[in-house]
Amino acid sequence: MCLLRHLLPIWVLLGFFFFSTATKSQESSVVYVSGASPEIPISQASPRMGAQSPGPPIVKVVLRQDLNKKILIALIVSSSLLCVTVMFLVYLLLWRYRNMKNSFTGIKRKSDSVKSVTTKPTVHKIDSVRKGTIPVYEYQLLESATNKFSDSNVLSRGGRGCLYRACLDEKSSVTVKKLDGGGETDIEKQFETEVDWLAKIRHQNIVSLLGFCVYRQTSCIVYELMQNGSLESQLHGPSQGSGLTWQLRMKIAVDIARGLEYLHEHCHPPVVHRDLKSSSILLDSDFNAKISDFGFATVLTTQNKNLIHKASEDLLDGKVTDKNDVYSFGVILLELLLGKKSVEKPSSEPESIVTWAVPKLSDRANLPNILDPAIKGTMDLKHLYQVAAVAVLCVQPEPSYRPLITDVLHSLIPLLPVELGGSLRIL
């Protein structure tokens, strides 16, 4: 009985109680329909009452046995239904508990043996990951989409990793950046920073983040498809810049300047990229340029002395300003003009393009002779002189002498045809 008290609801027990008591009760009740009430003595009856009731009282006896049987049947049926329902619910709960336990055990064994997608501690530090706003791609999907990261799907190499074309299905292709040096603390920090920044920034000249993947010691970032790879691969790869006309180069320069202007002027607080170079500029099928590689990006108020390269003041005192990005833009502009790498290594002593080019750019008569052979004689010389002057200003050793990126943009837009996003009208 104690066990039943714990298992069955109180109304079921009450049903059994009424059933046991009802069987013992078979008493009847007498209902007086007419005549003098037996509870009133005859001596106290009025003459009128006697006149109306000359004969003996008529009594109708109604037994409660039939009523008790109906109540008893109802209680038995309801109690039985409740018992069956409770037993079914208990069984269902036990069944679900066992299935959940077995499922959890199976998942745990599978993750221990296969070790599929790992969730490194650094991933959970990313604000956008915690908020669930960034899709997470399975490594097996990206591996299959790139044909196991085959060389045939390489868009460009360099920078912080290798870019691959990934075909997710017949209608969807993306760019996958597979980071080098997986597992190293600085690489993980760069990965974390880039994913977090790209999740917050939206601009036509900043690459769009589609998701990421972390698998064991490998980290991948998924971008929108950039069919033409990086600017570095276009300028210094097998084609040696032959596919980039003067107008396309000016378009790329304007696109980069627009992206930087958004970071410096329209982000609050302003953002400094700090790692701008030709390998971090990606090109889509129409050669629209978009900035990537935000692994070192920071807000303008933050000072960090762990700089890789860039302007001289960065290396000396670690100060970070928007003029750092202007210097880097000037280096890219020199690469577009001259077709040379930012740092050439013809001998044991590497030579910076700034050191080599700035003295030569001041000689207008000789300037056309040092241009990239792929664009010689294809531009208006006035436009060439203006671009060269902008580049020299951007790479000035003193940061205060460098222009704002907005001023740079306004200087270049008039040199670009309207159909390419500029204001130049060619008759």
Curated annotation (Swiss-Prot):
- According to the UniProt record, what class of enzyme is this? transferase
Q: Does the keyword Heme apply?
A: no
Ordered alphabetically, the record's keywords are: ATP-binding, Cell membrane, Kinase, Membrane, Nucleotide-binding, Phosphoprotein, Serine/threonine-protein kinase, Signal, Transferase, Transmembrane, Transmembrane helix
Q: Which Pfam families does the UniProt entry name for this protein?
A: PK_Tyr_Ser-Thr
Q: Does the keyword Nucleus apply?
A: no
Which amino acids does the record list as binding ATP?
A: L155, S156, R157, G158, G159, R160, G161, C162, L163, K177
- What is the recorded name of this protein? Probable receptor-like protein kinase At1g80640
Organism source for this protein? Answer: Arabidopsis thaliana
